[in-house]
């Protein structure tokens, strides 16, 4: 499973395109309570993700497994 494209939507929601042609929206608001993710509670920081190693990653090295994002996301038709 790989994230091939990602787009910030609003709040803590990101639209993700996966390598199996599925597009999902994931809301990460409740996923940021672990220490490494706390800086992401700042929305301006949260918005500055990139795709690295087949998933989304932030400047501090925080990332989420693409499988987790896929399972947590809601399919977009």
Question: How would you describe each model-predicted region?
Answer:
Residues 1-77:
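Motif-centric detector for short Cys/His coordination patterns
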């Amino acid at each position: 499973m790989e994230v091939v494209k990602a787009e910030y939507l609003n709040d803590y929601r990101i639209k993700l395109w996966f390598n199996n042609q599925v597009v999902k929206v994931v809301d990460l608001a409740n996923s940021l309570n672990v220490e490494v993710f706390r800086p992401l509670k700042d929305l301006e920081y949260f918005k500055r993700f990139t795709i690295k190693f087949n998933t989304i990653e932030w400047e501090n090295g925080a990332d989420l497994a693409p499988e987790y994002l896929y399972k947590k996301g809601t399919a977009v038709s």
